[in-house]
Amino acid sequence: MSLIVQKFGGTSVANTERLKNVADIVTKTAQAGNQVVVVVSAQGDTTDDLIVKAAELNDRPSKREMDVLLNTGEMISMSLLAMAIQKLGFPVVSLTGWQIGLETNSNYSDARIKRIAGERLKAELDNGRIVIVAGFQGINQMGDVTTLGRGGSDTTAVAIAATLGADLCQIYTDVDGVYTADPRIVKDAKKLDAITYDEMLELASLGAQVLHNRSVEMAKKYNVDLEVVSSFTRNSGTKVKEGSNMEKLNVSGVARDNNCARVAIINLDDTPGTAFKVFSLMAKHHVNIDIILQSVGRDNKKSISFTIRQDDAERVESILRDAKEMLGYEDLSINTKVAKVSIVGAGMASATGVASKMFEALAMAGINIRMISTSEIKISVLINEEDSEKAVKAIHEEFFNA
């Protein structure tokens, strides 16, 4: 007997027919002799609809009250799915985040999991029940309900799998695995049978919407085997697991991130501590920095460029203009019409010529590179946003079809 945690997203439980489909998947897993815990998200656009309803009453509601409201979406899904499974004749119980003892900090709307008590889950499983859990939610030390922010249901599923020592955590989505590129851009993108935690983390951080990076980080930390599968087909999915015994591809995937902006601070004093002033200011205002480039000019001056999320561009411009005298720069430029395109591969660390092939593909496609960033398993380039789709296609062709 195996213990399997299955997570179903909003599209998978969006309506009655899809709930029946999920009930069929879950009960077939149980019929195969497995203990099953299911984590569900809110149906379809439920969360967005609740946010709209709140805004109609108050355009600045407290995060605490928003968490109370948004918790209801997952509770609707869990109870409806439990009813569908009851109809099929299986013993089942639905539980909220606080009923399973999922304890969080008090950072409303983006809480972090501290622990899951686990006793209630184990008791229900030992009694032969399928357990349905509302994802995305927990409870803080004051007894207030909280929500876990983006990717919260994925994170709930992995946390439960880690707590119970599950044999597998399956993430059901509207795609049947992890591909070498976005199939909507690259028609001949190939599905990967397996990928390492580190590769999946990089792809998730680059905007691949299959898994949220918080859940992958937790899976890696607690060595939880993941599988990405489709709710709508019975095709095999992609396994995400420790890569030590896997044959490592030089490049496993190509990804793009259009939520980028390039900040250039021009003609700063070329003296010790200048970079510290810039980036401590960004840290103070909780701005995430990605690629950094420093270039030395004339007359003891230098320029510093870095990339941020496009969502932060206006705020960062205001922060830097207010700090112009303190930083002592001559000019400031912010470009929001850029994109980051990256290749990821665990085998890259021991391979030669990977960067050369990537840059050749971009050159042949007539695409100019503005910034470059590398790590042991990733190479990223910043390019014009209008070239991002063409870049993904060209790089994918070079590495997977040449």
Language-model-detected regions and their locations in the chain:
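Short phosphate-binding/catalytic loops that engage adenosine nucleotides
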Residues: 34, 90, 224, 287, ...
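Conserved H-loop
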Residues: 41, 231, 294
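Short hydrophobic alpha-helical runs that function as membrane-insertion/retention elements
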Residues: 168-172, 226-228, 290
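Acidic-aromatic/histidine active-site loop/patch
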Residues: 219
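Active-site C-terminal subdomain of aminotransferase-like
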Residues: 224-235, 258
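A conserved regulatory-domain signal marking ACT and ACT-like small-molecule sensing domains
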Residues: 237-402
